[in-house]
Amino acid sequence: MKQVEQQDREFLFHGNVEDVDAFLKRHPEVFSDDVRTDFLQAAREEELSSVRANLFSWVYGVTVDWREEDSEIVRLFGEFLPGEVIVEETDEGLTLSYAGEIYSIPLTFSPNDRYITIRGIADIIQKQFEIRLFRDSYWSDTHVFVLMSHVQWQALERSHTAEVEKIFQKITPELDFP
């Protein structure tokens, strides 16, 4: 289970070029030396808040293409959940096994299914976790999400209310690929 570390949550909102370098070094499995060099250059030339958000999304984001297979979406979010998530495709949609329970996510077998799946996962985990969209990814054909516990989201909202609202969008019934 991947979890968003406290120092990385704070990095999202505060930090200079040296902090960008430290973040990159904490995540060598994500950032090759060439990519690290590119991000350091960007941190020197571009708005730091945008660079920090981009880095954070590379490490903790769940990236969903508008053509993504729905079972793969479940698998990707499952990496951020405790325990095993098992998904099976059925004639009606998806069947998930999570935390000892079985859940169904009915699908329409249309492009709308990406967000039907995401909302279905969000409903299943809503007692402990929340999924939010990186706003900067909305107008793309690939959306990036972050899954964190309610405790983590609440702590961020208490300390960085305006910034959280600016960076993330809550998942709503209307939200879909543009």
Label every PLM stretch briefly.
Residues M1-P178:
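Contiguous interface-forming segments/domains that mediate binding rather than catalysis
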